[in-house]
């Protein structure tokens, strides 16, 4: 029997509201499957928010005839391209869960500083105005990834740290073409990085808990 769509929405909302366990072994312990489900839902939500924000900025500030050439020029300016992270689902499947979690954490942490200025860019945005707590959402996902790492690493020594990429803050003036292009490029990278983090988490969840939603 097919699941009731309303029940599915309510379940997803309930999972998004669940807090992360603060310590391994905390009582009551959250099952690993629930930790992954929570992380995937949060990553999907953030990726969709980033995509919607990017599209809105594009519609508001970037002439349609210039978008393609600007997008091509942006491709080389994401700091995440300088780390040896998988670029898609197939490459991600060749990495261990711990590696994918570390890359996901790296991507999320690289945006914690810049997004604190994002709400100033979108003070009148209908899309962003409904989700003006991006920093808190990123911190929440960071905590979820760290909870998964504690579970999977089981106290084993961590590998050498990869240099954390950093992004400039968003320009809140929007008074020059340079400021517009800078923000457009940052939003493009934000969208790409969250898509990567979502992909890594979904790959891990699917190969640990085989389910019908693994085709993506």
Swiss-Prot record:
GO MF annotation terms: growth factor activity; growth hormone receptor binding; hormone activity; metal ion binding
Q: Which residues carry this modification: Phosphoserine?
A: 131
Entry GO CC: extracellular space
Q: In which broad location class does this protein mainly occur, judging by the first location in its UniProt entry?
A: secreted
Q: Which domain of life is it from?
A: Eukaryota
Q: Which GO terms describe its biological process?
A: animal organ development; growth hormone receptor signaling pathway; positive regulation of growth; positive regulation of receptor signaling pathway via JAK-STAT; response to nutrient levels
Keywords assigned? Disulfide bond, Hormone, Metal-binding, Phosphoprotein, Secreted, Signal, Zinc
Residues that bind Zn(2+) = 45, 198
Which cysteines share a disulfide bond? 78-189, 206-214
What SUPFAM superfamilies would the database entry show? 4-helical cytokines (SSF47266)
Signal sequence interval, chain numbering: 1-26
Subcellular localization, as worded in the UniProt entry: Secreted
Q: Which family does it belong to?
A: Belongs to the somatotropin/prolactin family.
This chain belongs to the protein called Somatotropin
Species this chain originates from: Ailuropoda melanoleuca
Q: What is the lineage of its organism?
A: Eukaryota, Metazoa, Chordata, Craniata, Vertebrata
Protein's gene = GH1
């Amino acid at each position: 029997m097919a699941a009731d769509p309303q029940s599915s929405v309510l379940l997803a909302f309930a999972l998004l509201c669940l807090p992360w366990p603060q310590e391994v072994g905390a009582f009551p312990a959250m099952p690993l499957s629930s930790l992954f489900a929570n992380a995937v839902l949060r990553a999907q939500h953030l990726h969709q928010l980033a995509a919607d924000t990017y599209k809105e900025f594009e519609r508001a500030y970037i002439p349609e005839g210039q978008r393609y050439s600007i997008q091509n020029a942006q491709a080389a300016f994401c700091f995440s391209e300088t780390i040896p992270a998988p670029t898609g689902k197939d490459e991600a499947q060749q990495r261990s869960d711990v590696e994918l979690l570390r890359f996901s954490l790296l991507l999320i942490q690289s945006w914690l500083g810049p997004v604190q200025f994002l709400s100033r860019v979108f003070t009148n945005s209908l899309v962003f105005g409904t989700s003006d707590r991006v920093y808190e959402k990123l911190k929440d996902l960071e905590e979820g990834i760290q909870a998964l790492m504690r579970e999977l690493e089981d106290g084993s020594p961590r590998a050498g740290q990869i240099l954390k990429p950093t992004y400039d803050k968003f320009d809140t003036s929007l008074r020059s073409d340079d400021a517009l292009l800078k923000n457009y490029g940052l939003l493009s990278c934000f969208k790409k990085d969250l898509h990567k983090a979502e992909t890594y988490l979904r790959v891990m969840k699917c190969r640990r808990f085989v389910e019908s939603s693994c085709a993506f």
